């Protein structure tokens, strides 16, 4: 691959900039291409040695001692660092809770939530599994500039899971009790129950798991110097709001596509001949839908978001002359 090759008009490996995304973040397409880097599952297989080599290369570049190193190598090193280490703490994120592990480790729960005609225990079990995974991902990818005690996150986890199971169980109960609906209509509607349940529950999950940020605020900084100006509750509100919108949108294509696609595939006898085959095909459709919807949802807002100085608290406005300040939105 030629290094000057372009992708949708963007250079695939532009001049390397330390700490900057490979693609522009002021357009949806640029953010989408960046998110494909963020969720690349190949980074899950990187060894500790490979990570150390990447960090050494980036440190050498920062010190000005990395000479004749291709931009591609520098971008790949930064991609690996961003995929594995938390941007605020610098600590490793466990593979199941990285964005690159969201689909490989989350497809099982998504498939389980979309199983046809689930029993009450099955329904609640998969909602619990899904929201437990979401809660761990939210915690692992939070803005960590203001440390919080683990006890607060445990309480938030309980609230998120309770909300998810209550919403899903409540919707299913009312549909089953809707005797005026024909049985076929009830079955079709029941296939789409996970959509509003998961969308609402995922939004509440983010709010619960990141409530402490709203109370204490998050750090805002000058992008050109990296100087931390202070801690802002206004920025925290914007960060949590944007992330909540992302999580509310994520289940829409993910949970709409399989119920729309599976009825057509079920016309083939090979698919419905055995329950194992049906579950297998359903799992493939769910996984592909998950892989398609995740980068689209993440690209709605940039991870490193900007906020105008005028929007911040008065005491912070006096500490900088920059018109825009930045913060880590979290994922």
Swiss-Prot record:
Compartment(s) of residence: Mitochondrion inner membrane
Keywords: Amino-acid transport, Membrane, Mitochondrion, Mitochondrion inner membrane, Transmembrane, Transmembrane helix, Transport
Membrane topology reported for the UniProt record: Multi-pass membrane protein
Pfam families reported for this sequence: SFXNs
Recorded catalytic activity of this chain's protein: citrate(in) = citrate(out)
Keyword Membrane in record: yes
Transmembrane segments: 104-126, 153-175, 243-265, 278-300
Main location: mitochondrion
Single GO term (MF): transmembrane transporter activity
GO biological process, one term: mitochondrial transmembrane transport
CC annotations in GO: mitochondrial inner membrane
Similarity comment: family membership: Belongs to the sideroflexin family.
Xref: NCBIfam families: mtc
Role according to the record: Mitochondrial amino-acid transporter.
Name of this chain's protein: Sideroflexin-5
Native source organism of the sequence: Caenorhabditis elegans
Lineage: Eukaryota, Metazoa, Ecdysozoa, Nematoda, Chromadorea
